[in-house]
Amino acid sequence: SDGDNVIRVGATSTPHGEILNFVKDTLADEGYTLDIVIYDDYVLPNKALADGELDANYFQHTPYLNSFNASNGTDLVAAASIHYEPFGLYGNGVASVADVKEGATIVIPADDSNETRALLLLKQEGLIDLPEGANATDGVTTLDITDNHGYNIVTVQADTVAAQFNNSDEGSLAVINGNYALAAGLSSSDALAVE
């Protein structure tokens, strides 16, 4: 980055930026300055890293990284595995998966890897059917749903799912990435189901 001892890292604010802020003083004791750049979405930190504006980023899981590389012709690599954030299915005024009404809207992230994770979670909970053998490695999209059981599945940018859920009608559901759920004041214990 700007100097041999400056490390510029892009991250989403919760929990990634918070974790980086926690280690900032420890790195300073070792002679390094940690420059944290906060992003609201999942695309810009990878673009900034690929363009050399960052030394690293911290926000994604390996399937998302692989999908980003394939879609953007980049060759970004994971330097380390740090933690895993659970994906949760949240209900607005819905106490359990069994209480979901026909015609309910279910909002899920639209990017390849997280759409796959969301759809597999919905299948796990019996809310949709997918083809035999559907898996995270090969990926699935809403086009692969063989039976939506009368639910309206809507895909949106991952960083907007929590906000749309918070403004949704009672009876709606959303599958929310762990970091965005935390930022919205939700925890995995609030979820109807987790992957």
Question: Where would I find each of the regions flagged by the language model?
Answer:
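Short, well-ordered beta-strand elements
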Residues: 3-14, 32-38, 105-106
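Exported/periplasmic ABC-transporter solute-binding proteins
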Residues: 158-165, 172-195
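Short helix-initiation/N-cap motifs at beta->coil->alpha
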Residues: 36-47, 134-163
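Alpha-to-beta junction loops
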Residues: 50-60, 104, 127, 149-152, ...
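Ligand-binding "clamshell"
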Residues: 67-79, 94, 184-194
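N-terminal segment of the mature folded domain
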Residues: 30-33, 40, 45-90
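A conserved helix-loop-strand patch within extracytoplasmic ligand-binding domains
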Residues: 79-128
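Extracytoplasmic
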Residues: 4, 31, 74, 82-86, ...
